[in-house]
Swiss-Prot record:
Lineage, broadest ranks: Viruses, Riboviria, Orthornavirae, Kitrinoviricota, Alsuviricetes
Region (Functions as an uncleaved signal peptide for the precursor of protein E3/E2): 269-280
Full protein name: Structural polyprotein
Effect of substituting S545R: In strain: Isolate MM 2021
Basic residues: bias regions: 66-79, 93-108
Length: 1253
């Protein structure tokens, strides 16, 4: 069956009741009775007219205003009525109480829901008891499947229901005649407050929550309404989370039914709980009358409670027997939570230090100290009972305690708790105290008793609360932020925590015996005394009156007070009455709950930005944590607690860093390529510029260039010298040879062996003018040839610029391209230019807005702090006892012989043979485990999900898709498939530990192999499962002589040790800038790898050429350019167009990234673009519609060393060369190359000439 109701059948909605009117509506007089046979048509018409007038008048008066009150007559009538009432009161007083408790009126939300619920919900009953509700929603009737019983409606009860275990619902079609009673439903659930039977329901973060106590078993099936009266969810149960309860609900989305079940949910079906008495079962809330009330039969009532202690309805039975099912008692809500304490009593217990360094049996002995609350509050359990007077009733300012065998009371104002100083007591109830204490190594509790004596007990206890947040403060701040924490909730209402109670032992008291003339007198004093005398025979028994044992001595008798009509706490310092584990249970007040704590925010540090580093000046008011990490592949995490003024220098790279100071939010910064010098200046400025960016590469390049220049000059000089020598050698060896004038000039030959230039040229002019002109043109021709060679060389070298080589290797999306690879970097835009015949080019932009890498987890176990349960020891007087087997974690049991325990009244045993003590202990989960535990997981393949913004044409839409190469999403008619990602990387190891909101890569022991004092010393599948494993090296020790106690040794909690030594979490050291989050465990925004994209874009997404503007004469002029800065370049494009419109803009090289994807074309023919580049001399091709041009710029370095955003361009892999630097290199290389080529040419020519001779 479809569990989504329809909205088709609505004849009416709920009709509000008529408004309440304090006045009485006058009734019309009844018409006289007329016999039908005697009525004439005229009379009938008159009667019909009267009837219509009466109905109209009645309707008008009901909807009209209140009638005016008469002035005299009603007052007299009222006065007479008051007088009559006074007379009646004097005669017979009313049985009502003087101050009856007013019934709480329902609020506006409750009234609204009650009106709607009158029609659409029906009770579900089992054996006459309401167990839940069924709701009419749309065209269906829905009932929770776990609610047992039959709907209290004959038409609905006989329907055939289809059950769904997935949704915990039973569903059937509504009968036709009831469809008008059904409620509408809606899947729209904006965050805010909704209504249900018990008031407001808060909806936030996909969860419905209510104040704890507003819902209870029996509310299953109740609907939750919005303000329009539409059903948004059906309640199934709830999970107690402290101050609030999370509801388990069935609700609807647009297309399907969903069920939300928070952890720890309990079904709210009011199932009938049964208890047993003498093999006869009865409802726990209605105990049998023999016994049924503690005040009438206390001892029998306690035995009945002990027989039912493990039954689910135990607390219903406890409440019923304490209140005796008297409804008048329930109205006293202030004392309701203290009713159970009348069945208990305080006790005296052994205390090793009673404040003066000596042991005693103290009425305020300290049993336990709990410090699980992260806000520093502690909970102390003592032997006295607070908030109860000696009569057993609630009295807030009293403390009742045991003094001997008597119950006494003292003022609560004298109660004090000390560590290194006085503690602030925040709450008290029964055996428990909650207080804020300063750090210390001991704890003492004391009070002034009724005789003004100080009763105290001191124990060794190290109180050093861990800081909440990242600052170790001592005083709650006026201003700060709220962070999650745990605290003890100051409520005395019943909780899920409980303590065991048992029947107290017989208390020996030698003062009950007195010697009188050879006889022993037992003075009962109104108590029941159990006595045992060895003189004579038959001197064993109990008595409630004074008794004399003849011919006996005190040393031969043993007397003890016995009282089994009250419970006392199962203390390890007090023996239990019998070996059987008979016990009762009572709730523990002040439960641990999740809360928020206000923590201070450290003063903002003074920050000085430097070149690729920042200096923070820190002024802590208290120890404050400083952490930082790199956002690259190597995070290099660092943390330090700082308690005084310091300065710290943090290195910053282009990959970015993240630092956090105290409770301030984390700050992310990135370095820019700032430097001194200019990339477009003189050679020394260019060298200084590159030295600031790439010092090692610059030194190597300048050294190599200098060496090349020196070598070139030396080689040229050597070649010229060699050529000169070869030219002059023949003339030097020939006697009388004359060196020609030209050769002499070129080779610097001595003038003595050659004619002058004028004489040589005059001779050639006279003898041969042709040779004259050739001789004159030879040097000129050589110069012209050399210049042409250098020019061609420079033209060939210019295209080999490094910048051009980089740009040539950049992939560009061509026409009909339907695949792409985008970088997995949040905020880094990827753009592709798509050209199709007959269509205007279109720019496709893909930008990753967020990624989530979620591993598949398998929960191995949870671990937390343990508590050691030590039941009261059983002492067998004059005999032996044996250990019993128990299925308890780390259960230990030992029997010690030869013990002679003493209590405050004397020896506990009186016999000639040895006594034995049975000591037991075992381990259980601490009560804090529900709030403070670590979960050990095995992590498997991680699934990546990305949120990507897709822009093309007029479409700009965000979509979420799995990056696996299979998941396809449709955006604006186009289909996109992302993945799989190029790098199969995850920050999570195979084994991880999740603790609160932190994740740790840790190799933990498998289930069942925990070691004492290590992580995993106790293990269980959940915080409530019965499969608890423990290995804590628990060992029992022999009790000290004369003392009742259960000593033991045990390894400290491995979980608490792990908390102190767990190190840095993955949240603070994950590489690639990953942000680790929990619920579910995931890594967000990890900048690693690339995402392949396959797309199918339909033709409808393109613009036809005839519809797009025709752009011609496109030219680009760069006005401002700052490289390595986020869109620090501004380019102005001028063009001509035939009409206005919209054109796609795209850069065809990854040298520059253009911010705009499309621009509006206007008739003025001018647009401005912003671009980002890492090159000092970028040259990139830009297209606007179908027109293209090349933009060339001379960029300057950025001025800001550190910026709070990452770069939006591709970084250069190798050092980039500016155009000016290339020009200087070309000039120097050209000059040196020309000189070297000239030397080579001269040497070759001379060599060739000399070889021909």
């Amino acid at each position: 069956m479809n569990y989504i109701p329809t909205q088709t059948f609505y004849g009416r909605r709920w009709r509000p009741r008529p408004a309440y009117r304090p006045w009485r509506v006058p009734m019309q007089p009844a018409p006289p009775m007329v016999i039908p046979e005697l009525q004439t048509p005229i009379v009938q018409a008159q009667q019909m007219q009267q009837l219509i007038s009466a109905v109209s008048a009645l309707t008008t008066k009901q909807n009209g205003k209140a009638p005016k009150k008469p002035k005299k007559k009603p007052q007299k009538a009222k006065a007479k009525k008051n007088e009559q009432q006074k007379k009646n009161e004097n005669k017979k007083p009313p049985p009502k109480q003087k101050n009856p408790a007013k019934k709480k009126k329902p609020g506006k939300r409750e009234r609204m829901c009650m009106k709607i619920e009158n029609d659409c919900i029906f009770e579900v009953k089992l054996d006459g008891k309401v167990t839940g509700y069924a709701c009419l929603v749309g065209d269906k009737v829905m009932k929770p499947a776990h609610v047992k019983g039959v709907i209290d409606n004959p038409d609905l009860a006989k329907l055939t229901y289809k059950k769904s275990s997935k949704y915990d619902l039973e569903c059937a079609q509504i009968p036709v005649h009831m469809k008008s009673d059904a409620s509408k439903y809606t899947h729209e659930k904006p965050e805010g407050h909704y209504n249900w039977h018990h008031g407001a329901v808060q909806y936030s973060g996909g969860r419905f929550t209510i104040p704890t106590g507003a819902g209870k078993p029996g509310d299953s099936g109740r609907p939750i309404f919005d303000n329009k009266g539409r059903v948004v969810a059906i309640v199934l149960g709830g999970a107690n989370e402290g101050a609030r309860t999370a509801l388990s609900v069935v609700t609807w989305t647009k297309d399907m039914v969903t069920r939300y079940t928070p952890e720890g949910t309990e079904e709210w079906s009011a199932a009938l709980m049964m208890c047993v008495l003498a093999n006869v079962t009865f409802p726990c809330s209605e105990p049998a009358c023999a016994p049924c009330c503690y005040e009438k039969q206390p001892e029998q009532t306690l035995r009945m409670l002990e027989d039912n202690v493990d039954r689910p309805g135990y607390y219903d039975l406890l409440e019923a027997t304490m209140t005796c099912n008297n409804s008048a008692r329930h109205r006293r809500s202030v004392t309701k939570h203290f009713n159970v304490y009348k069945a208990t009593k305080p006790y005296l217990a052994y205390c090793a230090d009673c404040g003066d360094g000596q042991f005693c049996y103290s009425p305020v002995a300290i049993e336990k100290i709990r410090d699980e609350a992260s806000d520093g509050m502690i909970k102390i359990q003592v032997a006295a009972q607070i908030g109860i007077n000696k009569g057993g009733t609630h009295e807030h300012n009293k403390i009742r305690y045991i003094a001997g065998h008597d119950m006494k009371e003292a003022n609560r104002d004298s109660l004090q708790v000390h560590t290194s100083g006085v503690c602030a007591i925040r709450g008290t109830m029964g055996h428990f105290i909650v207080a804020y204490c300063p750090p210390g190594d001991e704890l003492k509790v004391q009070f002034q008793d009724a005789e003004s004596h100080t009763q105290a007990c001191k124990v060794q206890y190290k109180h050093a609360p861990a800081p909440v947040g990242r600052e170790k403060f001592t005083v709650r701040p006026h201003f700060g932020i709220e962070v999650p924490c745990t605290t003890y909730q100051l409520t005395t209402a019943p909780t899920e925590e409980e303590i065991d109670m048992h029947t107290p032992p017989d208390i020996p008291d030698i003062t009950l015996l007195s010697q009188q003339s050879g006889n022993v007198k037992i003075t009962a004093g109104g108590k029941t005394i159990r006595y045992n005398c060895t003189c004579g025979s038959g001197n064993v028994g109990t008595t409630s009156s004074d008794k004399t044992i003849n011919s006996c001595k005190i040393a031969q008798c043993h007397a003890a007070v016995t009282n089994h009509d009250k419970w006392q706490y199962t203390s390890s310092f007090v023996p239990r009455a019998d070996q059987l584990s008979r016990k009762g249970k009572v709730h523990v007040p002040f439960p641990l709950t999740n809360s928020t704590c206000r923590v201070p925010v450290a003063r903002a540090p003074g920050v000085t930005y430097g070149k690729r580093e920042l200096t923070v000046k820190l002024h802590p008011d208290h120890p404050t944590l400083l952490t930082y990490r790199s956002l690259g592949a190597d995070p290099r995490p660092y943390e330090e607690w700082i308690d005084r003024y310091v300065e710290r220098t943090i290195p910053v790279t282009e990959d970015g860093i993240e630092y956090r100071w105290g409770n301030n939010p984390p700050v992310r910064l990135w370095a820019q390529l700032t430097t001194e010098g200019k990339p477009h200046g003189w050679p020394h400025e260019i060298i200084l510029y590159y030295y600031g960016l790439y010092p090692a590469a610059t030194i190597a390049a300048v050294s190599a260039a200098g060496l090349a220049v020196v070598l070139s000059l030396l080689a040229s000089c050597y070649m010229f010298a060699t050529a000169r020598r070869k030219c002059l050698t023949p003339y030097a060896l020939t006697p009388g040879a004359v060196v020609p004038v030209t050769l002499g000039v070129l080779c610097c030959a001595p003038r003595a062996h050659a004619a002058s230039f004028a004489e040589s040229m005059a001779y050639l002019w006279d003898e041969n003018q042709t040779l004259f002109w050739l001789e004159l043109a030879t040097p000129l021709a050589a110069i012209i040839i050399l210049v042409c060679c250098l020019k061609n060389l420079l033209c060939c070298c210019k295209p080999l610029s490094f910048l051009v080589l980089v740009s040539l290797g950049t992939p560009v999306v061509k026409s009909y391209e339907h695949t792409a690879t985008i970088p997995n970097v949040v905020g880094f835009p990827y753009k592709a230019h798509i050209e199709r015949n007959g269509f205007s080019p279109m720019t496709l932009q893909l930008e990753v807005l967020g990624t989530s890498l979620e591993p598949t987890l398998n929960l191995e176990y949870i671990t937390c702090e343990y508590k050691t349960v030590v039941p009261s020891p059983y002492i067998k007087c004059c005999g032996t006892s044996e250990c019993r087997s128990m299925e308890r974690p780390d259960y230990q049991c030992q029997v010690y012989t030869g013990v002679y325990p003493f209590m405050w009244g004397g020896a506990y045993c009186f016999c000639d043979t040895e006594n034995t003590q049975l000591s037991e202990a075992y381990v259980d989960r601490s009560d804090v485990c529900k709030h403070d535990h670590a979960a050990a997981y095995k992590a498997h393949t991680a699934a990546m999900k990305a949120t990507i913004r897709i822009s093309y044409g007029n479409l700009n839409q965000t979509t979420t898709a799995f990056v696996n190469g299979e998941h396809t999403v449709t955006v604006g008619g186009s289909r996109f498939t992302f993945g799989p990602i190029s790098t199969a990387w995850t920050p999570f190891d195979n084994k991880i530990v999740v603790y609160k909101n932190d994740v740790y890569n840790q190799d933990f022991p498998p289930y069942g192999s925990g070691q004492p004092g290590r992580f995993g010393d106790i293990q269980s599948r959940t915080v409530e499962s019965k499969d608890l494993y423990a290995n804590t090296a628990l060992k029992l020790s022999r009790p000290s002589s004369g003392t009742v106690h259960v000593p033991y040794t045990q390894t400290p909690s491995g979980f608490k040790y792990w908390i102190k030594e767990r190190g840095t979490s993955l949240n603070d050291k994950a590489p690639f800038g990953c942000v680790i989050k929990t619920n579910p465990v995931r890594a967000e925004n990890c900048a690693v790898g690339n995402i392949p994209v396959s797309m199918d874009i339909p033709d409808t997404a393109f613009t036809r050429v005839i519809d797009a503007p025709a752009v011609t004469n496109l030219e680009c002029q760069v006005a401002v350019c700052t490289h390595s800065s986020d869109f620090g370049g501004i380019a102005t494009l001028t063009f001509k167009t035939d009409k206005p419109g919209k054109c796609a803009v795209h850069s065809h090289s990854n040298v520059a990234t253009i911010q705009e994807a499309a621009v509006d074309i206007k008739t003025d023919g001018k647009i401005t673009l912003h671009f980002s580049t890492a090159s000092a001399s970028p040259a990139f091709k830009v297209s606007v519609c179908s027109a293209k041009t090349t933009c060339m710029a001379a960029c300057e370095p950025p001025k800001d060393h550190i910026v709070p955003y990452g770069a939006s361009h591709n970084n250069q892999v190798f050092p980039d060369m500016s155009g000016t630097a290339m020009t200087w290199v070309q000039r120097v290389a050209g000059g040196l190359g020309g000189l070297t080529l000239a030397a080579v040419a001269v040497l070759i020519l001379v060599t060739c000439v000399t070889m021909r001779r």
